[in-house]
Amino acid sequence: MFGYVDLYVLPVPKKLIPFYRRMSTKMGKMMRKHGCLEYREFLGNDLHVKKMVSPLTMVKVKKGEVLVFAVTGFRSKSHRNQVLKRTMADPAVKKMCQGSMPFDHKRMVYGGFSTIVKV
Protein backbone atom coordinates (compact mmCIF):
# COMPACT_ATOMS: atom_id res chain seq x y z
CA MET A 1 0.00 0.00 0.00
CA PHE A 2 1.09 3.54 -0.60
CA GLY A 3 1.31 6.54 1.69
CA TYR A 4 -0.32 8.78 -0.90
CA VAL A 5 -2.61 8.26 -3.89
CA ASP A 6 -4.15 10.39 -6.58
CA LEU A 7 -7.66 9.39 -7.58
CA TYR A 8 -9.29 10.28 -10.88
CA VAL A 9 -12.89 9.74 -11.97
CA LEU A 10 -13.81 10.61 -15.53
CA PRO A 11 -16.45 9.90 -18.16
CA VAL A 12 -15.20 8.45 -21.43
CA PRO A 13 -17.30 7.84 -24.55
CA LYS A 14 -17.71 4.07 -24.99
CA LYS A 15 -16.59 4.27 -28.60
CA LEU A 16 -13.30 5.89 -27.51
CA ILE A 17 -12.33 3.32 -24.86
CA PRO A 18 -9.77 1.57 -27.14
CA PHE A 19 -8.06 4.92 -27.86
CA TYR A 20 -8.29 5.88 -24.18
CA ARG A 21 -6.67 2.59 -23.11
CA ARG A 22 -3.76 3.08 -25.51
CA MET A 23 -3.22 6.65 -24.33
CA SER A 24 -3.52 5.70 -20.65
CA THR A 25 -1.12 2.79 -21.05
CA LYS A 26 1.47 5.18 -22.49
CA MET A 27 0.88 7.69 -19.70
CA GLY A 28 1.10 4.97 -17.06
CA LYS A 29 4.42 3.76 -18.44
CA MET A 30 5.76 7.32 -18.44
CA MET A 31 4.63 7.89 -14.85
CA ARG A 32 6.21 4.60 -13.75
CA LYS A 33 9.42 5.58 -15.55
CA HIS A 34 9.49 8.80 -13.52
CA GLY A 35 8.86 7.11 -10.16
CA CYS A 36 5.14 6.42 -9.75
CA LEU A 37 4.81 3.22 -7.70
CA GLU A 38 1.58 2.02 -9.31
CA TYR A 39 -0.78 3.16 -12.04
CA ARG A 40 -4.14 1.45 -12.46
CA GLU A 41 -7.38 2.27 -14.25
CA PHE A 42 -10.78 0.65 -13.85
CA LEU A 43 -13.95 0.64 -15.93
CA GLY A 44 -17.17 1.01 -13.92
CA ASN A 45 -19.66 -1.83 -14.34
CA ASP A 46 -21.66 -2.01 -11.08
CA LEU A 47 -22.60 1.60 -10.37
CA HIS A 48 -26.29 1.48 -9.38
CA VAL A 49 -26.48 0.34 -5.75
CA LYS A 50 -29.84 0.87 -4.06
CA LYS A 51 -29.98 3.54 -1.36
CA MET A 52 -26.52 4.85 -2.28
CA VAL A 53 -25.32 7.72 -4.43
CA SER A 54 -24.15 6.52 -7.82
CA PRO A 55 -20.68 7.69 -8.84
CA LEU A 56 -22.28 8.42 -12.22
CA THR A 57 -23.75 11.58 -10.68
CA MET A 58 -20.31 12.94 -9.73
CA VAL A 59 -19.43 13.77 -13.30
CA LYS A 60 -22.89 13.69 -14.87
CA VAL A 61 -22.19 10.75 -17.17
CA LYS A 62 -24.06 11.16 -20.45
CA LYS A 63 -25.64 8.57 -22.71
CA GLY A 64 -22.92 6.68 -24.57
CA GLU A 65 -20.30 7.30 -21.87
CA VAL A 66 -18.77 4.98 -19.28
CA LEU A 67 -17.08 5.85 -16.02
CA VAL A 68 -13.34 5.30 -15.56
CA PHE A 69 -11.69 5.35 -12.14
CA ALA A 70 -7.91 5.64 -11.89
CA VAL A 71 -5.47 5.47 -9.01
CA THR A 72 -1.78 6.30 -8.91
CA GLY A 73 0.37 5.40 -5.90
CA PHE A 74 3.26 7.29 -4.34
CA ARG A 75 5.36 7.22 -1.16
CA SER A 76 4.14 10.67 -0.07
CA LYS A 77 2.61 13.88 -1.37
CA SER A 78 6.08 15.33 -1.96
CA HIS A 79 7.04 12.18 -3.89
CA ARG A 80 3.88 12.61 -6.00
CA ASN A 81 4.80 16.23 -6.71
CA GLN A 82 8.30 15.21 -7.84
CA VAL A 83 6.96 12.43 -10.08
CA LEU A 84 4.36 14.69 -11.69
CA LYS A 85 6.94 17.42 -12.29
CA ARG A 86 9.29 14.97 -14.03
CA THR A 87 6.45 13.32 -15.96
CA MET A 88 4.97 16.57 -17.24
CA ALA A 89 8.44 17.79 -18.30
CA ASP A 90 9.00 14.66 -20.42
CA PRO A 91 8.91 15.57 -24.14
CA ALA A 92 6.88 12.44 -24.97
CA VAL A 93 4.21 13.41 -22.43
CA LYS A 94 4.14 17.00 -23.68
CA LYS A 95 3.58 15.73 -27.21
CA MET A 96 0.83 13.36 -26.11
CA CYS A 97 -0.96 16.12 -24.18
CA GLN A 98 -1.01 18.36 -27.27
CA GLY A 99 -3.16 15.86 -29.15
CA SER A 100 -6.89 15.36 -28.81
CA MET A 101 -8.04 13.74 -25.59
CA PRO A 102 -10.67 10.98 -25.55
CA PHE A 103 -12.49 12.61 -22.62
CA ASP A 104 -13.63 16.03 -21.37
CA HIS A 105 -11.01 17.00 -18.77
CA LYS A 106 -13.34 19.72 -17.42
CA ARG A 107 -15.65 16.97 -16.13
CA MET A 108 -12.87 14.92 -14.52
CA VAL A 109 -12.86 14.58 -10.72
CA TYR A 110 -9.36 14.55 -9.22
CA GLY A 111 -7.82 14.64 -5.77
CA GLY A 112 -4.84 13.56 -3.70
CA PHE A 113 -5.36 11.43 -0.59
CA SER A 114 -3.19 10.37 2.35
CA THR A 115 -3.52 6.85 3.74
CA ILE A 116 -5.37 6.75 7.07
CA VAL A 117 -5.96 2.99 7.44
CA LYS A 118 -3.74 0.11 6.36
CA VAL A 119 -4.80 -3.42 7.31
Outline where the language-model segments fall.
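Residue-level signal for secondary-structure boundary sites
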Residues: 18, 78-80, 118
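Long, hydrophobic N-terminal alpha-helical segment
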Residues: 1-25
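Short, well-structured hydrophobic secondary-structure segments
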Residues: 17-19, 29-35
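Alpha-helical interaction segments
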Residues: 9-10, 29, 100
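Glycine-rich beta-strand-turn "strand-cap" elements at beta-sheet edges
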Residues: 32, 36-63, 89-119
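Aromatic side chains
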Residues: 4, 8, 20, 39-42, ...
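Short amphipathic alpha-helices in soluble, non-transmembrane regions
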Residues: 21-27, 83-91
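Short, well-ordered beta-strand segments in beta-rich or mixed alpha/beta enzyme
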Residues: 5-12, 51-87
